[in-house]
């Protein structure tokens, strides 16, 4: 397999070295307040650990936390803003119901919450197109989700990029 992106910098215990990772992100895009991104990383990491402890994992061998970091790295390469990076880091935790939008808004504000909500709406469209998924929505709900997704995209194109 070809590796296009460098592995996350790690500590001796194998955990992601958040400070080194943020420094690497800061080389790619401007961070207004790196501490906010640091807080998002620590929070997402803690939520994932709590889910692991409760045996509520996304998929064997997969890490929703590291997936969020990967998403943020791609967005940093595209020079997206800090709010987009924070939204990418915490999105999987919301999607996997390890937390909710109310808590995201409390911690990171309305802009990050708006982005995460918009990405969730887009994800709902793909879920609704999978007929084998028991979480599928009714046709009316699918239409409403599509309408909301399009409104969100018109409002903020960062949603599509995340």
Task: Give the role of each language-model region.
Residues 1-162:
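Active-site helical microenvironments for divalent-metal-assisted chemistry
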């Amino acid at each position: 397999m070809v590796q296009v992106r460098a592995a996350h910098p790690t500590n001796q215990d194998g955990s992601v070295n958040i400070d080194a990772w943020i420094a690497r992100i800061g080389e790619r895009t401007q961070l207004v307040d790196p501490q906010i991104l640091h807080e998002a990383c620590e929070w997402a990491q803690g939520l994932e650990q709590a889910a692991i402890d409760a045996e509520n994992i996304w998929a064997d061998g997969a890490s929703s936390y590291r997936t969020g970091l990967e998403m943020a790295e791609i967005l940093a390469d595209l020079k997206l803003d800090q709010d987009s990076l924070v939204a990418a880091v915490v999105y999987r935790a919301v999607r996997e119901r390890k937390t909710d939008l109310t808590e995201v808004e409390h911690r990171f504000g309305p802009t990050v919450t708006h982005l995460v909500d918009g990405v969730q709406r887009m994800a709902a469209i793909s879920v609704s197109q999978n007929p084998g998924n028991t979480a599928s929505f009714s046709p009316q709900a699918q239409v409403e989700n599509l309408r909301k997704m399009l409104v969100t995209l018109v409002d903020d194109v960062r949603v599509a990029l995340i």
